[in-house]
């Protein structure tokens, strides 16, 4: 049976890539596409907006107007995603969430919703980035206690949250491995006379410039040597294809909260 996908934010950069990814994938089809109220794209064919030709799916501004989907893929903003979660819980729809920038209350709302529906919630849907998460855990076990750890990330000028969700996830994987709390050990800004660096800090640096899709590098730096683990994305299709892969994997799950580590079966590495 063909899995039907709904996409919110269909007219955005990521939304257009998601439409293309669904169209190219086997075993799935686009069932619904949505944009914010007042968007000039409402009523347009989703495929034409994505530049792949007509799909017969018109963009709507209300999830209640088109429930012809099994899984909703959401790469929007926290306030919108939280409303979409309520709809999916009420209507028994599964979700793939790529939105970043949630506060603790937002994350708890996702956790609560996952008691009733199945959700994949990840900061990054790239296969490569999720492999990097595991490599960081390995490096932290070997070098984390005596090295300075810094996370450097760069994204396009339009990204609204900083550090990126992926950078924070990298820090969380490292902190958990080392038995540290990122909230107390993370350093997100340095300016002026800061004093010497504390050994147990996990530092973050953010770049916003041009059209950078996404670049992340983690340093494990000691005196005399430095190990760098890095990932660079050159196309949003990497994330879109990963999200569709997650949706297909999620189709067999009735409820629960998962991430790409589960989807890719990386827990045993």
Curated annotation (Swiss-Prot):
NADP(+) binds at residue 36. GO terms for molecular function: 4-hydroxy-tetrahydrodipicolinate reductase; NAD binding; NADP binding; oxidoreductase activity, acting on CH or CH2 groups, NAD or NADP as acceptor. PROSITE patterns: DAPB (PS01298). Its main location: cytoplasm. Disulfide bonds: none annotated. It is found in: Cytoplasm. GO terms for cellular component: cytosol. NAD(+) binds at residues 9-14, 35, 98-100, 122-125. It is an enzyme of class 1 (oxidoreductase). (S)-2,3,4,5-tetrahydrodipicolinate binds at residues 156, 165-166. Gene3D superfamilies: Dihydrodipicolinate Reductase, domain 2, NAD(P)-binding Rossmann-like Domain. Signal peptide: none annotated. It catalyses: (S)-2,3,4,5-tetrahydrodipicolinate + NAD(+) + H2O = (2S,4S)-4-hydroxy-2,3,4,5-tetrahydrodipicolinate + NADH + H(+); (S)-2,3,4,5-tetrahydrodipicolinate + NADP(+) + H2O = (2S,4S)-4-hydroxy-2,3,4,5-tetrahydrodipicolinate + NADPH + H(+). SUPFAM superfamilies: Glyceraldehyde-3-phosphate dehydrogenase-like, C-terminal domain, NAD(P)-binding Rossmann-fold domains. Pathway: Amino-acid biosynthesis; L-lysine biosynthesis via DAP pathway; (S)-tetrahydrodipicolinate from L-aspartate: step 4/4. The active site is at 155 (proton donor/acceptor), 159 (proton donor). Its EC number is 1.17.1.8. It comes from the Bacteria. GO terms for biological process: diaminopimelate biosynthetic process; lysine biosynthetic process via diaminopimelate. Belongs to the DapB family. This is 4-hydroxy-tetrahydrodipicolinate reductase. It comes from Actinobacillus pleuropneumoniae serotype 5b (strain L20).
């Amino acid at each position: 049976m063909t899995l039907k996908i709904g996409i919110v934010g269909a007219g955005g950069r990521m939304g257009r890539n998601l439409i293309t990814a669904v169209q190219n994938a086997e075993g799935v089809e686009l069932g619904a596409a949505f944009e914010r109220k007042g968007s000039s794209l409402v009523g347009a064919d989703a495929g034409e907006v994505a530049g792949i030709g007509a799909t017969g799916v018109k963009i709507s501004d209300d999830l209640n107007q088109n429930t012809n989907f099994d899984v909703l893929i959401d790469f929007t903003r926290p306030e919108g995603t939280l409303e979409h979660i309520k709809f999916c819980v009420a209507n028994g729809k599964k979700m793939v969430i790529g939105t970043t920038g949630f506060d603790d209350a937002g994350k708890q709302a996702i956790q609560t919703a996952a008691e009733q529906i199945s959700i994949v919630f990840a900061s990054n849907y790239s296969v490569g980035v999720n492999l990097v998460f595991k490599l960081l855990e390995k490096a932290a076990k070997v070098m984390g206690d005596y090295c300075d750890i810094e996370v450097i990330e760069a994204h396009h000028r339009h990204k609204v949250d900083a550090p990126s969700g992926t950078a924070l996830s990298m820090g969380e994987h490292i902190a958990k491995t080392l038995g540290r709390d990122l909230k107390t050990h993370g350093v997100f800004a340095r300016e002026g006379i800061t004093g010497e660096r504390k050994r147990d800090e996990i530092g973050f640096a953010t770049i916003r410039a041009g059209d950078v899709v996404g670049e992340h590098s983690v340093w494990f730096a000691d005196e005399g040597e430095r190990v760098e683990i890095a990932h660079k994305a050159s196309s949003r299709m990497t994330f879109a294809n990963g999200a569709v892969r997650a949706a297909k994997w999620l189709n067999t799950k009735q409820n629960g909260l998962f991430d790409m580590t589960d989807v890719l079966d990386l827990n045993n590495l």
